[in-house]
Amino acid sequence: MRRFKRKHLTAIDCQHLARSHLAVTQPFGQRWTNRDPNHGLYPKPRTKRGSRGQGSQRCIPEFFLAGKQPCTNDMAKSNSVGQDSCQDSEGDMIFPAESSCALPQEGSAGPGSPGSAPPSRKRSWSSEEESNQATGTSRWDGVSKKAPRHHLSVPCTRPREARQEAEDSTSRLSAESGETDQDAGDVGPDPIPDSYYGLLGTLPCQEALSHICSLPSEVLRHVFAFLPVEDLYWNLSLVCHLWREIISDPLFIPWKKLYHRYLMNEEQAVSKVDGILSNCGIEKESDLCVLNLIRYTATTKCSPSVDPERVLWSLRDHPLLPEAEACVRQHLPDLYAAAGGVNIWALVAAVVLLSSSVNDIQRLLFCLRRPSSTVTMPDVTETLYCIAVLLYAMREKGINISNRIHYNIFYCLYLQENSCTQATKVKEEPSVWPGKKTIQLTHEQQLILNHKMEPLQVVKIMAFAGTGKTSTLVKYAEKWSQSRFLYVTFNKSIAKQAERVFPSNVICKTFHSMAYGHIGRKYQSKKKLNLFKLTPFMVNSVLAEGKGGFIRAKLVCKTLENFFASADEELTIDHVPIWCKNSQGQRVMVEQSEKLNGVLEASRLWDNMRKLGECTEEAHQMTHDGYLKLWQLSKPSLASFDAIFVDEAQDCTPAIMNIVLSQPCGKIFVGDPHQQIYTFRGAVNALFTVPHTHVFYLTQSFRFGVEIAYVGATILDVCKRVRKKTLVGGNHQSGIRGDAKGQVALLSRTNANVFDEAVRVTEGEFPSRIHLIGGIKSFGLDRIIDIWILLQPEEERRKQNLVIKDKFIRRWVHKEGFSGFKRYVTAAEDKELEAKIAVVEKYNIRIPELVQRIEKCHIEDLDFAEYILGTVHKAKGLEFDTVHVLDDFVKVPCARHNLPQLPHFRVESFSEDEWNLLYVAVTRAKKRLIMTKSLENILTLAGEYFLQAELTSNVLKTGVVRCCVGQCNNAIPVDTVLTMKKLPITYSNRKENKGGYLCHSCAEQRIGPLAFLTASPEQVRAMERTVENIVLPRHEALLFLVF
């Protein structure tokens, strides 16, 4: 192929080139003389090309081992653009047999091992390179018109390097000055031109380095410092020896490593952190433990190039800088007036400790990223990890420090290391199914998608609320489109919705629908299927003579329920409950004789239920849980699937787990272990009980922002001691202090409270439009009316022609009436009917009018409703912009600093189900959460009182300021530097705490040693200490005495 012709430049062309950026960026391509600085840009007469000479100078430093090339222009002798004075030697190689970027292998010597030959710095001339020259392919600066660009991957071999002629440079100069590059929009990031990153220009013979291994170790360390520790150890350390050495270096991100090792309870890490706390006076007995934390942080080493004045200038816009400066100046003057200027890390630590939200930490990072700042982000990140691990350890040691500070740091660092916004673009996982929306996957989701299921594997995905577990399964099924999957869940509506979003290689079913197809259909064809659950009323009618009664019938029902939920093949005495309620409503232990009678009656009842013949007794009909049990006992085979997805795995019963685990294919259990709210149905948490081969976590919620995420994480932290994995949200705004806007969801624990709220919001001249979750029919307003009719005297029923529609309730008209019905409900422990009876007794004669009003205000489309009402059980899986948590959940009676007045209260006294219900309610919110006073009290158990620091000089501008605590008479002292202010908050009962300034004594009672950032211990101790009087509602006081 012919070589391209040189372009002859006119004088005008030379003037354009002299003014272009190429004259600056390519200084080696210009002739510099004393007379004419643009002399090298003039046209050069065509001369005969001479033979190439052997060049000896090499211009790339030694640390660019993999990319070293022979220089083709001796700059000391000639800097002419059109000459090439270097020649390659035949047979020389550019790569050594084993380089520092080779993959680690067992038994292989390291890069510095004895006997390893020094790497050759030459290369051989290849026919491919000669072809590139012949075709005019330009690879200057790494941009090739003929071949695709490199990708940021780590291959074991390097791409062959092309040789560049001097004519290529001249050709490109003319093309860039007068022509538009058509491929400009398609090229990727520019490769590295040389070891000086092109700042000194590039030579015509020199090819740009485009391989990540060509980066210096210092640059790699800087890049790796931004990655999660899990990625560094599980993935990057396996790439090559060089990367492993960088990651294993004890001087590389030491605090980040120590933080994660401490969370894992590694013995050496715990010992090291404990030693730091002890040696630096960061102990529970020390009033100055927080100030000592700042002092220790100030010892953090930083680069010699750090200019404190420039860093301070970068922080000038941070809202907490004046408070931080005042704190350090007053309490740590030696760090503020140091010889080299103010200690920057002391100011950073003070800002972090005074921060009241994640926004304060994010603003701090933003300021320190400014070009005017001389600190590096790895140094800042290391400092934050240092503070984080010490704060975490302080809480472990019982020091009264708020978990909010650690949460703020963790949240920012998590987003920095895992958020998609940290990279220019995160690759979206393409959908192979037409019409499916492409979504961006998080780092945690991508780890799951990369796992290939094998037979008999058991994978657990522990997913917090709103973390996209369903979308993760959808993307998994799309990626592994050649496999067949079975998606199973418990809720029919969820299964229907799954059918619409999953690809065609996934079959979506409920467990009961599969059992119905194999077993239940047979009973339906014989009209022997009970559409409702077995009740003590049904069972009582078939018990043996002399052994009846609703209490014994309840015992038999519970025995059968335990058997249906278990994986056992035979019904035994072990299925009989240990405890029951007697006729006086007291909880007593079941006697052995009652156990034997209970298992005998339950076995007889189960035998009659299994028969396919006709039956006259309602109790002998097969139930849904009954035919599911029969299907489990038949040992079904699901061998046609490659893997089974079990959604909401925390609600699995042992019977269901037995069905799934007995299959030969792979199993994926997905769920949130903290959303287990169906233990009363015999559910056990499969995410804890089932042994696994692999476990993954989804911790970042797409549903809500930081404030709501903090409340959910604190409930798990304080009430369930969950600290190893932390719930985080997104970067969008969310509020928890009572700012309700637009549509509001009112979530309750019981149906009785739902009815109360429906009555309240539909009152007045302009009643609100409401929507009951699950529909008005499922709420049971008809049964409320029937119970009210049952309550009316017989004469009144006849007079008003009142007819009870419900078959079961109608039976009590001719039995014992309303009083007998109520006794039965109490003995049967039927919570649903108990709630309805409570509603009827509370509103009595108003029931018909209230039910009619609720039905009139109810609309089916929730998008047009002003209020959405329902219980947490029905709201599970849903989400709403604003959630209003009602006041019938588990209660913490007072704030932490007043709990010593209630010695009988224990968080551990309540079951996990109660805390799970509250957690589910809170995590339904997307934008705003309206809390109860009890929920705020839970946050105080973690040290969060919604306080923010202000300069005392600003507080006292208007005169004397009193403490906002009602029973406190202290005033804010003038000689203190900072004062804490309680932020206002509106509770779900519409009461408002307007907040205000706290005296330093009251602040110390609430936030402990953090108060000594505002005033000295002597000043705080000199103030009068106020003890608040706690007045509890009578029923709550009795409850705490009982427990």
UniProtKB/Swiss-Prot annotation:
Spans annotated as Disordered: 30-56, 101-191
Cross-referenced InterPro entries: DNA_helicase_UvrD-like_C, DNA_helicase_UvrD/REP, F-box-like_dom_sf, F-box_dom, P-loop_NTPase, UvrD-like_ATP-bd
Source organism superkingdom: Eukaryota
Annotated residues for binding of ATP: A463, F464, A465, G466, T467, G468, K469, T470
Motif range (APIM motif): 807-811
GO CC term (a single one): chromatin
Annotated pathway: Protein modification; protein ubiquitination
UniProt keywords, alphabetically: ATP-binding, Chromosome, DNA damage, DNA repair, DNA-binding, Helicase, Hydrolase, Isomerase, Nucleotide-binding, Nucleus, Phosphoprotein, Ubl conjugation, Ubl conjugation pathway
Top enzyme class: isomerase
Gene Ontology biological-process entries: DNA catabolic process; DNA damage response; DNA repair; double-strand break repair via homologous recombination; negative regulation of double-strand break repair via homologous recombination; positive regulation of intrinsic apoptotic signaling pathway in response to DNA damage; positive regulation of protein phosphorylation; protein ubiquitination
F-box domain span: 138-184
Intracellular or extracellular location(s): Nucleus; Chromosome
Span of domain UvrD-like helicase ATP-binding: 442-705
Basic and acidic residues compositional bias, start-end: 158-170
Pfam families (UniProt xref): F-box-like, UvrD-helicase, UvrD_C
Record field: catalytic activity: Couples ATP hydrolysis with the unwinding of duplex DNA by translocating in the 3'-5' direction; ATP + H2O = ADP + phosphate + H(+)
Family (UniProt): Belongs to the helicase family. UvrD subfamily.
Disorder noted: Defects in FBH1 are frequently observed in melanomas, resulting in increased survival in response to replicative stress. Its inactivation may play a role in oncogenic transformation.
Comment, domains: The PIP-box mediates the interaction with PCNA.
Complex formation: Part of the SCF (SKP1-CUL1-F-box) E3 ubiquitin-protein ligase complex SCF(FBH1) composed of CUL1, SKP1, RBX1 and FBH1. Interacts with RAD51. Interacts with RPA2. Interacts (via PIP-box and RanBP2-type zinc finger) with PCNA.
Function statement: 3'-5' DNA helicase and substrate-recognition component of the SCF(FBH1) E3 ubiquitin ligase complex that plays a key role in response to stalled/damaged replication forks. Involved in genome maintenance by acting as an anti-recombinogenic helicase and preventing extensive strand exchange during homologous recombination: promotes RAD51 filament dissolution from stalled forks, thereby inhibiting homologous recombination and preventing excessive recombination.
Name of the molecule in the record: F-box DNA helicase 1
Source organism per UniProt: Homo sapiens (Human)
Name of the encoding gene: FBH1
